[in-house]
Amino acid sequence: SFQVTVSSLPKDIVRQSLKQLDSVITPDLKAAYKKHGLSVYEAITLASIVEKEVPKAEDRKIVAQIFLKRLAEGTPLGSDATYYYASAVYGGEPFPDLDSPYNTRMYAGLPPGPINTVSKTALEAVAYPSDTDYLFFVTGDDGVNHYTKTSAEHEQATRLYCKVSCATGYVPDSL
């Protein structure tokens, strides 16, 4: 982290932010990203999605692994956070069919850029994801993530654990 004052110029904030990021992304992390077929920029983009999807650090490695599997398979990431980001940036109501390159429910691959700031734990999660068979996750109304291996299990977990949030739509904490 770094300090910003009211008199800080935008270029100085960006410079400080990049310097901080450069100190976190070590050669080992860069090598790990490369093993996953990701550039540093792509890893930052994926980490930003992981960061926004799951605020709890202990869940990030599992979610990173799920998203990395989807990228490798060429299937959409399916992140609600990305279409909420698109609606906040480009205007309009957030919905899964929002036509934007940031909508990873609609388009496979990574969006054009990060959707959020990233933490060291999110960057490390992308570099060193969990090793599980999970392909899906849903965050329940209680904030607990439920991981599943099949689409049918995911639909059941959504019905059981996400009655309110999933009925009203994803509500981001901040964009």
Regions from the language model: what does each represent?
Residues 1-175:
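Bacterial extracytoplasmic/cell-wall-associated proteins, especially those involved in peptidoglycan
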